[in-house]
Amino acid sequence: MASQEFEVEAIVDKRQDKNGNTQYLVRWKGYDKQDDTWEPEQHLMNCEKCVHDFNRRQTEKQKKLTWTTTSRIFSNNARRRTSRSTKANYSKNSPKTPVTDKHHRSKNRKLFAASKNVRRKAASILSDTKNMEIINSTIETLAPDSPFDHKTVSGFQKLEKLDPIAADQQDTVVFKVTEGKLLRDPLSRPGAEQTGIQNKTQIHPLMSQMSGSVTASMATGSATRKGIVVLIDPLAANGTTDMHTSVPRVKGGQRNITDDSRDQPFIKKMHFTIRLTESASTYRDIVVKKEDGFTQIVLSTRSTEKNALNTEVIKEIVNALNSAAADDSKLVLFSAAGSVFCCGLDFGYFVKHLRNNRNTASLEMVDTIKNFVNTFIQFKKPIVVSVNGPAIGLGASILPLCDLVWANEKAWFQTPYTTFGQSPDGCSSITFPKMMGKASANEMLIAGRKLTAREACAKGLVSQVFLTGTFTQEVMIQIKELASYNPIVLEECKALVRCNIKLELEQANERECEVLRKIWSSAQGIESMLKYVENKIDEF
């Protein structure tokens, strides 16, 4: 599968919202400044290293400011000492006995003028930046020199033996390079990912079999010299190896990072959340992470609020599922960012498009939803859903089409279709009665009853309920255990469970979508949805 990777380039800023919760301004690599987003701290649980580095850099800025103030004080004191020493020299050279003749007075004036010139020269020396660096070196130990030698071999700088003391004081990055692989410099500009191989450099054969360790400062310093590439695993650089940032470690090919960094520009590139794209197209409303043995699809919509579904979001999810079906992933983890899992269809979006041309727009939207539901029905690999918050409408009705549903204890589930002014979708007209009985299904589909996570688990809509504080950790532990199983066994188990109801689900999806098309193509149906959009109350 041809793919590119886009990651968090840096955490730019930090703030507190009106509720006192911490938020970080995240800059995505490959995106412009205007695409920066404020993310709550809980969204960055897989990027704790990145958050830690940002906080540490803020602390070091404060220390640097204090050091600059100290240097200025030292500079002023040095000027005073120089002035005093000049005056002392002048007093020694001046006559000690009073003279009254003009000859001696002219000599005194010359000496005084000379002393003024000395003071001016001393002040100019102290004000010069290069000279001040020499002076400041007496009060603070200089950083060790770069371990790179300036000699080159065929356009590449060679590595000299490292100072063992300097090496112990710096972070170690383990690398392994394979001959003939193209590497991408992670310190290149944000848009470099989308420009093909313009910023990739061919590894010289003399360096092809090198394996060992280099310091982070070496990799950082190499970015400023021509003909130098950062030595990382070529498979990881080309996007063909699994990479993730699960807490508490960072994993990426052959790279291993020890946590005592003082080389922020290099380290911040090593802690990231991956955005995976196929055929050089970027997902806008979801984040796809290629993990070890499974693919995680995170619903994180930008075009809608509260992870609502419109045609663009639905198409991105379908594309991500089709890609996961074709790659070597054993299963799929479907989750969401924020406090809401999914609030169903974005009816404001649907009303806006249905107003222009009801017949054509309703047919296109129904086909999109039909394809979306059929993708879940026909997906051969197991789908695990991590429900972190409220699941409403289509966000709840697709859950029975998945294989395992793990819910946060604060999550709740509701399908108030009559309130929406539409009919059931997502095969809920058949899955809900089979799962929880007709009475409970009618309570949800017609009366719009809300189920807590515990109630949903008791009725079979949810597999397990986890505590809020350990929800993410529990999900990752269990999903990694599932990913360690034989993929053939996983697929065959799902096939045996679904074989008797697959055709029935497809027929139910066809019926539901036909009813939706009739409602959306009618004036009464649009009016009902518009009334809901105008009168809906924010429950979150």
Swiss-Prot record:
- Can you list the GO cellular component terms from the UniProt entry? nucleus
What does UniProt give as the signal peptide span?
A: none
This protein's record includes keyword Nucleus? yes
Query: What tissues has this protein been observed in?
Result: Testis-specific. Detected in spermatids (at protein level).
Residue stretches making up the Chromo domain: 6-66
Q: Report the subcellular localization.
A: Nucleus
Q: Where is the composition biased (Polar residues)?
A: 87-97
Q: What GO biological process term is on the record, naming one?
A: spermatogenesis
* CDD domains with a match to the protein in the record: CD_CDY, crotonase-like
State the protein's name: Testis-specific chromodomain protein Y 1
Q: Which organism is it from?
A: Homo sapiens
